[in-house]
Regions:
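Phosphate-handling catalytic cores of nucleic-acid transaction enzymes
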Residues: 1-399
């Protein structure tokens, strides 16, 4: 994942983490990208042809003991610590409230209201609780699971709640309205629900189950999938004592933005995005695979959302208070988006390489990956086929 367009402070944080823990750089770089976007929440928005906040759904892929979990855990620890403090305050206020309610009615403080728990991270929950949680924290909540497989398995666990279709609509911030018997109705005008977690490569096929390849769920995921994720030798190096604390301060700078920032694209950024959009549309039109068409369609959106994220990085690190996304920021966002195009193709190969999936055009993927400059060896490895087969397909495709 390219980080050359990140501020120097964040590049230093990423490189220090890699030096100490010997994990693929993609894992920590993506974790920085995601935690930055989540810290921004709904407070910075691009108001252009379409409105976009940096809403990301991220899937970090790696083998067991590859180090895929810890980088995101470190970057998200800021929010977990905030939740811990908030929960302790909630318990204290709940105790006071219950004590007050035990008094005779005439002696109660009539102005005292039942406390609420403000939280960022959602792990184990029932689907109908999300709107209630979100109504308390309207700047953004995150469904965060170490293993997304467990989260996917939970779909339908609660009386066929339709959680999957609800999640699909929240990606584009469609209103959420929950009405339940004996419950107060909840309405969320513009949901801001982030998603992050990990998955092992051999379990990727589960992503496509229950119609998720066809209904657009799979194409909404940004996949972090480094080429090498083997467990590395032990390193005696340690992070500097203030490294994580300083990163928390960085996230706090974004999390505590009070007044919403509304952005526009500079002329240069708009030209860059327009040119890239047209190239992306051409690639989509030339592809016959439904899943990949869906991916390319979401990349249009993600390029802008990532641009807002990069803007937030520069706002805090470089004190860039302009309310325009400039050409440099857009170029960085496009480069990162292209990384996620490549990983989507890699995921496609892992999920759909089974010969039983006859309806899916593997040859089209081979030709397309070759057009991106991937070697025959890399293509064969990604699709789990022989290099001679790749060579044969490319020879026929070039005739």
């Amino acid at each position: 994942l390219p980080i050359e367009g990140f501020p120097q402070y964040l590049q230093g944080f990423i490189n220090e983490y890699v030096d100490v823990y010997n994990v693929p750089r993609d894992y920590i770089a993506a974790s920085v990208l995601f935690s930055t976007a989540f810290a921004i929440g709904s407070r910075i928005e691009l108001n252009d042809k379409y409105d976009n906040i940096p809403l990301l759904w991220m899937n970090i892929i790696g083998n067991v003991s590859s180090g895929k979990t810890e980088p995101l855990s470190v970057c998200m620890s800021y929010f977990n610590e905030k939740d811990k403090v908030s929960f302790n305050e909630f318990k204290m206020r709940s105790s006071l409230y219950e004590s007050e309610m035990e008094k005779p009615k005439k002696e109660r403080d009539t102005f005292l209201q039942a406390p609420s728990y403000f939280q960022y991270i959602i792990n184990d929950y029932t689907p109908e609780t999300i709107p209630s949680i979100h109504s308390i924290n309207n700047r953004g909540v995150c469904i965060y699971r170490d293993e997304l497989k467990g989260w996917l398995d939970d779909f339908g666990r609660y009386n066929k709640s339709g959680e999957q279709s609800t999640m699909l609509s929240t990606f584009y911030r469609q209103p959420m309205q929950i009405n339940r018997a004996s419950k107060v109705p909840v309405y969320i005008d513009k949901p801001c629900i982030y998603l992050a977690g990990g998955m092992q490569p051999e379990l990727l096929v589960d992503l496509a189950k229950d119609n998720r390849a066809e209904n657009g769920f799979l194409s909404r995921l940004l996949n972090v999938f480094p080429d090498a994720d083997t467990k590395q030798p032990y390193s005696k190096d340690k992070l500097n004592a203030d490294t994580v604390a300083n990163y928390h301060k960085y996230l706090s700078g974004l999390d505590t933005i009070r007044d919403a920032i509304n952005l526009t694209l500079s002329k240069q950024a708009e030209v860059m995005y327009s040119d890239w959009y047209d190239r992306n549309a051409e690639q989509s039109n030339n592809n016959s695979t439904g899943y990949l068409k869906g991916v390319y369609g979401k990349l249009d959106v993600y390029a802008l959302r990532i641009a807002v994220t990069i803007y937030g990085m520069n706002l805090i690190c470089n004190q860039n208070t302009s309310e325009e996304i400039d050409g440099t920021t857009m170029r960085t966002a496009i480069n990162i988006t292209e990384y996620f195009r490549a990983t989507a193709l890699k995921v496609y190969g892992k999920i759909f390489s089974d010969s039983k999936s006859k309806s899916l055009n593997k040859k089209a993927v081979i030709i397309y990956m070759s057009s991106l400059g991937k070697s025959q060896s890399d293509i064969a490895k990604a699709l789990n086929v022989g290099q001679s087969y790749v060579s044969q397909v490319l020879k026929k495709g070039n005739k």
